A protein has these predicted regions:
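An intracellular "coupling" helix at the cytosolic face of ABC transporter transmembrane type-1 domains
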Residues: 1, 41-44, 54, 58-61, ...
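ABC-type nucleotide-binding domain
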Residues: 71-314
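Pre-NBD coupling/linker segments of ABC/ABC-like ATPases
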Residues: 61-73
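Cytosolic ends of transmembrane helices, especially the final helix of ABC transmembrane type-1 domains
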Residues: 28-55
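A hydrophobic transmembrane-helix motif
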Residues: 1-22
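Transmembrane alpha-helix boundary and packing residues in multipass membrane permease domains
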Residues: 2-6, 50, 241
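Conserved catalytic core of two-component sensor histidine kinases
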Residues: 22, 29, 152
């Protein structure tokens, strides 16, 4: 266009010819721009296909012909019996002969440094992985025999990876629960601290969340996940760093309400935060994949302080 102005001034082309050239240039370049967009979408489609293909090729949790033991309600006795475990494609074992027993209604904290294996305990208890050796038992039954649906309905869990879905706050709390009543959802939200921020929004529990809870703070996401774990009133609560993203005041309030709510249930808290030790009576310290200490928290003060020195990455 700039060069065309000089050509018009020199009388070599007309104004109409310049305008026609600009129009034709735009039409010639438009398909190239669309081609670039198409290539971008192709790469996105290929990435999505690979993810879906990996999901479809994964081993089924319910293989055809497999029969499970139905346990609609569990008492909450948890036992690790000489459990050894290594993650796929890892040469170093995450757990090495871990053994302990937690009685129904007992309140226990599992502590350890980064990479010690304490979060691996949670994943094995939920059946997300199977031990290489030994057994994980609930109510004296190997969890590999228990129907996975029954197992997870009886264990309310909060893991470090917070997963929220596109939907309302109510739907994110109630997902996985069997026909939850509004009263159950509201009570779980109150205990977890969801009520504190939802009550101020005009949409309330119908507030729409983006995928993975985009737009919410880390503490708000954790509160919704904790409410999800509580809504079914499971006999076992498994909480892995449930308040790590909350501010001090919110954490204090949640702990106070949890202490009352956990009465009569088996509570397993995996943490490096000493504030959560108010919820428990017993401490198990995991060191390098083994049980380094196990006993009443009052006699394990030195060990717990040492174990609480790092953040979890196991």
């Amino acid at each position: 266009v700039f060069y065309g102005v000089f050509l018009i001034t020199a009388g070599e082309v007309s104004m109409g010819a310049l305008i026609a050239s600009v129009i034709l240039t735009g039409r010639a370049l438009a398909p190239l721009a669309q081609l670039a967009q198409t290539l971008t979408r192709l790469n996105q489609a290929r990435s999505s296909y690979r993810s879906l293909d990996a999901l479809m090729r994964a081993d089924s949790e319910r293989p055809e012909g497999r029969h499970w033991i139905s346990r609609p309600r569990l008492d909450g006795r948890v036992r690790f019996d000489d459990v050894h475990f290594s993650y796929p494609e890892q040469t170093v074992a995450a757990l090495k002969g871990v053994s302990f027993t937690i009685q129904p209604g007992e309140k226990v904290a599992i502590l350890g440094r980064i990479g010690s294996g304490k979060s691996t305990v949670a994943r094995l208890l939920l059946g997300l992985y199977a031990p290489d050796k030994g057994a994980v038992l609930v109510d004296d039954t190997d969890i590999r025999q228990i129907d996975p649906g029954d197992l997870r309905r009886n264990i309310g869990s909060v893991l470090q990876d917070v997963w929220l879905f596109s939907g309302t706050v109510r739907e994110n709390i109630a997902i996985g629960a069997r026909r939850p009543r509004d009263a159950d959802i509201l009570e779980a939200a109150r205990i977890a601290g969801v009520e504190d921020f939802v009550a101020r929004h005009p949409s309330g529990y119908d507030l729409m969340l983006a995928e993975r809870g985009e737009g919410l703070s880390g503490g708000q996401k954790q509160a919704i996940t904790l409410a999800r774990a509580l809504v079914g009133q499971p006999p076992v609560l498994l909480l892995d760093e449930p308040t790590s993203a909350m501010d001090v005041q919110n954490e204090r309030d949640v702990i106070a309400r949890l202490k009352e709510e956990a009465e009569g249930r088996t509570l397993i808290v995996i943490t490096h935060r000493t504030s959560l030790l108010d919820l428990v009576d017993r401490v198990i310290v995991i060191e390098d994949g083994r049980v380094g200490a196990d006993g009443d928290k009052s006699i394990l003060t030195r060990a717990t302080r040492q174990a609480a020195g790092g953040k979890d990455g196991a």
